[in-house]
Amino acid sequence: LLGSSELMGADPNDYLPALINAAERLNRGAMAVQGPPGTGKTYLASRLIKHLVEKGKRVAVGTNSHAAVENVLNDCISAGIPKEQVFKVRDKDDKSDKDWTAFSSADTLVTGLKRNPGPLVMGGTSFALCNKKVREYKFDYLIIDEAAQYSLVDLIAASGIAQNIILFGDPQQLSQVVQAVHPGGVANSALGHFIGENSILPSELGYFVELTRRMHPELTKAVSWLAYEGRLG
């Protein structure tokens, strides 16, 4: 399904064709994208979302926090998705203007979903993704950003909202923030469960983005050797 596990290029846009191809071939399945610091994970996620919406798909986006979700949605707007196709329930403590379509509650979000049966993006934390009324409006894709911080339990609970799941993140960069203890490996993060004991995501499960633009080359070499089996460039 996925082919080479390593995405290589001088620009994040070089990676998009492979990701788009793999995402379109998912059939009630899941894949992941492991991107170390500075590899453009959120950029890739937002451009993939834009392509899916242009193809008529409905995409749900989740992370642990309102701020993280809104970061992805703002990138989706920057990518060119119209505000009218980007939905989210407003954080109750946030009264600022938004570039996307903000709703005051899950009930008003449901009304918006009912009135807009076509392609769109809906962002939310686990509370929104697991809301019984919201889940009635099925999505084609569920995309989780910073999936190394997103608990496996939350992913299982939210997974019923969509036919396909795509995880973006890096367990080597940010680990799960939840400290609760559960038996049987359930305490693992969503992406940590995918990767298992490996430093690099297995090729049959997704892609490793190998080029970072954030660090000095000499520092990148050290980090690559210590955490990424020498594959980060």
Task: Outline where the language-model segments fall.
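Conserved helicase motor core of SF1/SF2 NTP-dependent helicases
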Residues: 54-56, 63-67, 75, 79, ...
